[in-house]
Amino acid sequence: MGLLAGILLVKIAPEEQKPLRRYFEWMRKLILLLIFLFPGFYYLNNPIYIIALLIYLVFIIFVEYKLGSLLRKSIIIYTALGIIFYLSSKNSNLFAIESSLIFLHGVPSASLMFSKKEKNYPEIFISNLGFLLVAGLAYFI
């Protein structure tokens, strides 16, 4: 839903996409950090979870800074967010926070990826199907 909101934001106010680009990039990175920070607080007394979460965060930071295309970054990041989404479902408070943050992460991500000239919204949704697949498969396994 966050991706849809981001695309709608650019469709409604396309003239704001370029001036807000820098802020969208910072907001996307900050929200991504918060997505990893809240489970860290929840699992604070379990060092194994903290270490796994830190390794996971380092991997996401590596992807963030080494891949050039935002669409390719999004494929990996949203697949990883699907795992966090599933793991947070065990605690309703953490699940509400993580769900909200994943939604909020989708708004600037889609706003940065969407091109009104190219009309690439199918590519955006297809490249982020990893989130739905991972979260759905993890739920049924």
Q: Could you tell me what each predicted segment is?
A:
Residues P19-W26, L71, N91-F95, Y121:
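Hydrophobic, aromatic-rich alpha-helical transmembrane segments
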Residues P47-K117:
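Membrane-proximal helix-loop-helix units in multi-pass membrane proteins
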